[in-house]
């Protein structure tokens, strides 16, 4: 039962899907952390895989860059394939001195300059938030592993190359823990279709200081984020 953008059959996906932006990162996650992996889709080279993590069936699929792209994949996964939970795992930029490069952050909510949630919410502001139990499970998973995480609001930007850098000062004032491009869209889609969602990000660069991670450092901290995400799935099952 293929959709316009996913050529998988019903039952190919687990009820929980981890979603990085990069489809090659999805492949890395599947090959590194999952067992008994099967590739289930590849339309537009947006790869999806299903395997097991400590015996638990889990899927992983790329979502591309930006709210329009991730919203398409999240909608089809939830509406057409019966996915119940989505965990976005990606990178973000920091704007606060309290947030350091290589930190792992959990987005309990997502502000945005996109109008996408106003469009779906009849012109009104929609509070795009993560599922509380998923946030709690991720915090507990991180604590059990000794991985420090920061929890707060993300900012999902429409533009990567912004013409308004002064907005970063406003974000800092309001305590934004990371700037990325998808969480608000995924949270909106999950709310619209009765699913649950969470975003966990690794800070890859600091917008204010210009500090950036090397590719090796990104990989190491990304692995911490992935362990938190996968362990949180198991904790969520135990509730």
UniProtKB/Swiss-Prot annotation:
It catalyses: a purine D-ribonucleoside + phosphate = a purine nucleobase + alpha-D-ribose 1-phosphate; a purine 2'-deoxy-D-ribonucleoside + phosphate = a purine nucleobase + 2-deoxy-alpha-D-ribose 1-phosphate. It holds the Pfam family PNP_UDP_1. It comes from Vibrio vulnificus (strain YJ016). Gene3D superfamilies: Nucleoside phosphorylase domain (3.40.50.1580). The record marks 218 as: Important for catalytic activity. This is Purine nucleoside phosphorylase DeoD-type 1. Belongs to the PNP/UDP phosphorylase family. Its EC number is 2.4.2.1. A purine D-ribonucleoside binds at residues 5, 180-182, 204-205. It comes from the Bacteria. GO terms for biological process: purine nucleoside catabolic process. The active site is at 205 (proton donor).
């Amino acid at each position: 039962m293929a959709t316009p953008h996913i050529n998988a059959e019903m039952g190919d996906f687990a009820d929980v899907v981890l979603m990085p932006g990069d489809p090659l990162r999805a492949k890395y996650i599947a090959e590194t952390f999952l067992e008994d992996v099967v590739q289930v889709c590849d339309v537009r080279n947006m790869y999806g895989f299903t395997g097991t993590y400590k015996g638990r069936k889990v899927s992983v699929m790329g979502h591309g860059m930006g709210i329009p792209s991730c919203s398409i994949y999240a909608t089809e996964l939830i509406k057409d394939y019966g996915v119940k939970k989505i965990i976005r795992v990606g990178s973000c930029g920091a704007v606060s001195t309290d947030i350091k490069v290589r930190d792992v952050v959990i987005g309990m909510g997502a502000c945005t300059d996109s109008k996408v949630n106003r469009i779906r919410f009849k012109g009104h502001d929609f509070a795009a938030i993560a599922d509380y139990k998923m946030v709690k499970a991720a915090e507990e998973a991180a604590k059990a592993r000794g991985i420090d995480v920061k929890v707060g609001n993300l900012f999902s930007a429409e533009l990567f190359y912004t013409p308004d850098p002064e907005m970063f000062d406003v974000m800092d004032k309001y305590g934004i823990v990371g700037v990325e491009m998808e969480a608000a869209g995924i949270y909106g889609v999950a709310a619209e279709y009765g699913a649950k969602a969470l975003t966990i990000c690794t800070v890859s660069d600091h917008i204010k200081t210009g500090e950036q991670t090397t590719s090796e450092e990104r990989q190491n901290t990304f692995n911490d984020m992935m362990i938190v995400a996968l362990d949180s799935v198991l904790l969520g099952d135990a509730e």
